[in-house]
A protein has these predicted regions:
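Metal-associated gating/positioning segment near the N- to mid-region
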Residues: 108-120
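Active-site His/Glu-centered metal-binding helix of metallohydrolases
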Residues: 101-109, 341, 601
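Flexible, low-complexity linker/tail segments at the boundary of structured domains
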Residues: 248, 731-732
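Proteolytic maturation boundary segments
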Residues: 43-70, 262-350, 354-356, 415-419, ...
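Bacterial Sec-dependent N-terminal signal peptides
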Residues: 1-46
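Hydrophobic, small-residue-rich alpha-helical packing segments that form membrane-like cores
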Residues: 184-252, 256-258, 263-271, 278-288, ...
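M16 family metallopeptidases and their MPP-like homologs
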Residues: 70-72, 77-94, 100-102, 120-173, ...
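OB-fold/S1-family RNA-binding modules
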Residues: 723
Length: 965
């Protein structure tokens, strides 16, 4: 797998301010320190900032051979562990004849190692992992980027004998014992070609072509990990082995292990396992290639027929913070400050996005690595625009950047940004005993690769709660001035190659950059309302009955207006309560003629805001709170979803009340929505894949009027008033709504708020259910193959099988077995043996409403010249499964994964929310007897299940290919 861009960090020296920090490091350190003037490295090196502690819960060490390791015991998930090996190497280190081999090598790590050869001497890495429920792609994966390569084994069931030892052995082999057999290399060439085919999008081609302009004379001018297809097809075996032996070595590798483990025991095992990995003699220097400064602006403009929408990126380059200078309070403060600036500027840009005629369809700012280079940082702004709005978008980005640089931000903007930051920090602190292994792994990998600090949440929470309130707005505004220098400017514009589409010239862009300081601008005015979310509480209802010990250990409440509530308290997360409210009806209630309106209803309603607050104002009034509520219209249900911190439960109840009773009409926001939607739909037409979904929907539903394929010309037909009328109809009667709450909810605290707000929801006691809209999937065999011009010749093939099947827990489990078995079969037969695709994806859906039916979908992409052969293999393997069932090996692998996943789900709030909903919506307990059914499944069960589906004779095949030349 290729990481599209490296992981990015924020940070740099900040500006001259004095801060009194009391009780830092839990009252052990009181310090007044200076954050240096500007981003001047020479000044920064003179500053003596207090060092940050290293999280005491992680053990960090280094073996004699140079290998670094991080080991931590963590409780959750129980009996699980994460095993990572991070390498400080990537595509930047390739020689010209090796372009693409860093990524190729990553693939080869899964195709034979010393202890997992994948031949008659022993199982390979993937087959062995799957025997213990570690699924390839889900729990077993890797990525190659420009400066790093990272492999992972995740969610390993270490309570099973030998799993921990074997995972260590895999890391050991990845470090120094990948076999790189000739025949395996040749087989993998095809897989890499198909990965290139699937990823070689218009925007990637543009960026690749522009790199020499963005990085003139620098090593980063040719560094994309996919490399050269000519190299992939023809490189001699020696070239990849040379790269491997030169760069995969212990002094550039870090092992990270976090899980429900004994740290002492794992450390001892690691030392023993890696003892035979030799320290390199006279190793090649690992160079971090610099990026040159530029006095005059660099402007890179590129186009491609398959780029969706025009995009603009503006970079103001800064010197990167050396890894050795990150582990101090000054760096932590600088991260905070640049984060606040981006947050405040993003809020301004979002306001413009919501305007009636927005200058861009999206816009944001950031402080991170400069494009793809980790040796230079940059303050950046980016936006997407309408096809005819490139210059307007660019001008507006520059205008807002200059406005912020010249006038700074306001106290109210800073207060909101800081409140949101501290809320997020508090949430992480509250979850410190519930944090999962993966969160720590990501921190330690970044510490190894990039020197990012790892003080631990307790120390960070204490420090930042002292530091953040003491960094004044004046400091932020001074930093903003430093972030936008007159030199080191880079502008990248990418867009569709379309007749009549006008792009600014390089000279015009430079003129705009140089004219920033002469713009006639006024300071931003922050319009803030002091009005509360609700001026007065509604006249609440009452809880008329309460029953403890209901389904799944929930408590059932019935309110005086008919609303039914189920509350399940859990301790899985400390700072989360989830909510769902649902009622039967949904889109099915409305006639076919309203299809366009109900297709966009959710988005249209959301843009208006609630009560007296626009969407922009609502964001402001909710600053510092962890809460969200949104409504949605499904095919057969209307729903309201919410999540909050326990302390913000009343706010979630207020938002829910307003969602039912006070959707807000905002004509300007609606016009903005329409303009942005038109632009996005027009842009999407450039993407060849946009047509495959339309073709599939037409094939499935035989052009049913309720299937809406949105086109730009349809946007003006959307009826805002009708949408509001339809929405109000669905939410004017709460008497048949059932609400579910799952999470860290205190029932006695919640009950009066539930009664006050949910009990006050309108009720007219309608008795209704959903309607059958006769939207049936096409019967019989249907095939549609069509050709479409593509820059990278690709065939995309979709198979869809449908039929009747009872909605039962066993059938749901059988469908999961079937899709997982097919995934493994197709990986072996189509990806590995044929080298014909990057992956075949299988999806299944078992439906009860409006009628019971089963769907099985299979999708893959390949070389058009191979499509018929591979499609034949896909169909043949499906028929084999229907005739003979799966192999015992595949059957057992799926069982292992499903039982592991089931055990993990028991401590997930989302899992129990879904079960509560399913119990009442489907009238079925989807947990009772689950493990017994999984264990009882036989190959014959799966064979019959798939055979019963195929016998019904309903097959749709849609293929998009390229015209014959």
């Amino acid at each position: 797998m290729i990481s599209p861009l490296p992981l990015r960090q924020i940070g740099q020296e900040t500006i001259l301010i004095f801060i009194n920090m009391k009780h830092l490091f839990h009252s052990l350190l009181a310090v007044a320190f200076v954050l240096c003037a500007g981003f001047q490295q020479a000044v920064a090196q003179q500053m003596q900032f207090p060092p940050l502690p290293v999280d005491k819960n992680v053990r960090i060490g280094q073996l004699d051979n140079g290998l670094t390791y991080y080991i931590r015991h963590n409780k959750l998930p129980e009996n699980r562990a994460e095993f990572y090996i991070a390498q400080k190497v990537g595509s930047i280190l390739e020689e010209p004849q090796q372009r693409g081999l860093a990524h190729f090598l990553e693939h080869m790590a899964f195709n034979g190692t010393k202890n997992f050869p994948g031949d008659d001497k022993g199982l390979g890495v993937i087959p062995w992992c799957e025997t213990v429920g570690i699924k390839f792609g889900t729990n077993l994966n890797a990525y190659t980027s420009i400066d790093e390569t990272v492999y992972n084994i995740s969610n390993a069931p270490i309570d099973r004998t030998g799993v921990l030892d074997s995972c260590l052995l895999i890391l050991h082999d990845w470090s120094n014992y990948i076999l790189l057999k000739d025949d395996e290399i040749d087989k993998e060439r095809g897989v890499i070609r198909e990965e290139w085919r699937s990823r070689n999008s218009g925007i990637l081609r543009v960026y690749t072509d522009l790199l020499p302009t963005i990085y003139p004379g620098d090593k980063y001018a040719d560094c994309m990990p996919i490399g050269s297809i000519d190299v992939i097809n023809n490189f001699p075996y020696k070239d990849i082995r040379d790269y491997y032996h030169k760069w995969y070595r212990p002094d550039l590798q870090g092992i990270v292990i976090v899980g429900d483990i004994d740290v002492d025991a794992v450390e001892a095992k690691l030392k023993a396992v890696f003892a035979d990995v030799q320290k390199p003699i006279n190793p090649a220097e690992r160079t971090y290639y610099p990026v040159a400064d530029n006095k005059e602006p660099i402007v890179a403009i590129g186009t491609d027929k398959e780029v969706d929408d025009p995009s603009i990126e503006i970079y103001f380059k800064q010197d990167a913070t050396p890894d050795s200078e990150k582990n101090n309070v000054g760096y932590l403060a600088s991260q905070y400050m640049t984060s606040m600036i981006s947050s405040m500027l993003d809020a301004r840009l979002n306001e413009l996005v919501q305007s009636a005629n927005p200058p861009f369809t999206r816009a944001s700012s950031d402080y991170s690595d400069f494009f793809v280079a980790k040796t230079k940082e940059a303050f950046s702004l980016s936006a997407s625009s309408k096809a005819d709005g490139i210059e307007t978008a660019l001008k507006t980005l520059l205008q807002e950047t200059e406005r912020a640089r010249r006038f700074g931000f306001t106290e109210s903007e800073y207060a909101r940004a800081r409140a949101n930051y501290l809320q997020s920090l508090e949430s992480a602190y509250n979850e410190r005993e519930k944090t999962k292994h993966g969160s720590y792994v990501r921190e330690y990998v970044q510490n190894f690769l990039n020197g990012e600090p790892i003080p631990g949440i307790e120390a960070e929470y204490a420090m930042m709660n002292q530091l953040a309130p003491n960094i004044p707005l004046q400091a932020m505004n001074m930093v903003m001035q430093q972030l936008v220098p007159d030199s080191n400017q880079v502008v990248i514009i990418a867009g569709p190659a379309k007749k009549g589409l006008k792009y600014p010239t390089k000279e015009e862009v430079i003129s705009l950059l140089k004219g920033m300081k002469d713009l006639d601008l006024q300071a931003y005015v922050d319009k803030v309302s002091d009005e509360p979310l609700m001026k007065e509480a509604p006249k609440g209802g009452k809880i008329i009955s309460e029953k403890e010990g209901d389904i799944y250990g929930s408590t059932k409440l019935v309110l005086s207006n008919g609303v039914t509530v189920y509350v399940k308290k859990t301790d899985f997360k400390a700072d989360e309560i989830r909510m769902k409210g649902t009622s039967l009806g949904g889109k099915s209630i409305f006639p076919d003629k309203d299809a366009l309106n109900f297709a966009v209803m959710d988005n249209v309603i959301a843009v208006g805001g609630l009560g007296n607050f626009s969407q922009v104002d609502l964001t402001k009034v909710l600053a510092g709170k962890k809460v969200s509520v949104n409504a949605g219209l499904g095919a057969t249900t209307e729903n309201v979803f919410g999540t909050c911190s326990p302390k913000d439960f009343e706010t979630m109840m207020q938002l829910t009340y307003l969602t039912f009773t006070a959707p807000r009409k905002d004509t300007e926001a609606f016009e903005s929505f329409k303009n942005r939607m038109k632009a996005q739909l027009e842009s999407a037409q450039a993407n060849p894949l946009s047509s495959i979904n339309d073709s599939l929907q037409k094939a499935m539903y035989n052009n049913h009027p309720r299937v809406v394929m949105m086109k730009p010309e349809m946007v003006d037909q959307i009826d805002y008033d009708r949408i509001l009328e339809m929405y109000n109809d669905r939410f004017k009667d709460a008497s048949d709504f059932t609400f579910y709450f799952v999470g860290n909810i205190d029932l006695e605290t919640a009950k009066p708020l539930i009664a006050e707000y949910l009990g006050a929801l309108p009720a007219i006691n309608r008795k209704e259910t959903f309607k059958d809209t006769k939207m049936s999937i096409r019967k019989g065999v249907y095939k549609n193959e069509y050709a479409k011009e593509q820059q990278t010749p690709t065939a995309t093939i979709v198979f869809l099988y449908s039929g009747k099947a009872p909605y039962t827990l066993k059938n749901d489990i059988l469908l999961s077995f079937a899709t997982q078995v097919l995934d493994m079969v197709y990986t072996e037969e189509v990806r590995e043996k044929e080298g014909g695709t990057y992956g075949v994806n299988c999806f299944g859906d078992l439906q009860k409403y409006p009628k019971e039916q089963l769907l099985l979908q299979i999708v893959f992409q390949t070389d058009p010249a191979k499509k018929d052969k591979l499609a034949g293999i896909v169909v043949d393997e499906l028929k084999k499964l229907a005739a003979k069932g799966p192999s015992d090996v595949h059957l057992q692998k799926v069982k292992e994964y499903m039982l592991k996943k089931y055990a993990d789900n028991q401590k997930e709030n989302g899992y129990w929310m879904n079960n509560l909903n399913d119990y009442f919506y489907y009238g079925m307990d989807m947990t009772e007897g689950y493990t017994d059914i999984v264990n009882s499944i036989t190959a014959k069960d799966i064979q019959k299940f798939v055979s019963d589906l195929l016998k019904q004779g309903n097959e749709i095949e849609v293929t998009m290919t390229v015209p014959n030349k």
